[in-house]
Amino acid sequence: MIRRRVVRAVMMTPDRHVLLMRVQEPVSGIEFWVTPGGGLEPGESDEDALRREVAEETGATKVSPGQLVWSRQCDFTWDNRDYSQHEYFYRVQTDRFVPVMDGNPAQGEASAFLEFRWWSFDDIGRSEETFSPRDLHSLLEGLSRNEPPEGPADEGV
């Protein structure tokens, strides 16, 4: 089992949109939407890891990590490897930009990436797509009202 600490950017615009990435698990083919982020390197702070991951995955280089808004523990299998990771989600206020994934050094990660999309909170609530965390819509709604979640984010996908 691979254990790791992960940081994720909840990149929100003033008009209630959030940047998500659609990814596909290589073995099962299951597709779902996630926030940009990834694992910390040895000695790296959460803030530095978040800046690095966002730059690698979206091309955005002027990211100012905001407050820690959610955390969760999740166990899953990816590419026939078992993971146990603790994820920390940081709010990042931003204007919309056109994301590009050309700085990701891990080819395996780049090949699992399918697309970016700026989702409105309302569209997430109405969608039949799969999001990670599964309760992303309610978490975003609470965040927009400055209400902390009652517990950890749903482990979901």
Summary of predicted features, one role per range:
Residues 1-19, 39-42, 66, 89:
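Conserved N-terminal beta-strand and adjoining loop/helix that marks the start
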Residues 3, 42, 46, 132, ...:
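Hydrophobic (often cysteine-bearing) scaffold residues that line and stabilize catalytic clefts
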Residues 13, 25, 78:
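Acidic surface patches and DE-rich sequence motifs
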Residues 21-23:
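Short, acidic/hydrophobic/Gly-rich beta-strand patch recurrent on exposed beta strands
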Residues 27-31:
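A conserved beta-turn-beta hairpin within the catalytic core of GNAT-like acetyltransferases
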Residues 33-35:
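A short gly/proline-enriched turn/hairpin at secondary-structure junctions
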Residues 40-64, 72-129:
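Unchanged
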Residues 127-157:
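Charged phosphate-binding loop/patch that engages nucleotide di/tri-phosphates or the phosphate backbone
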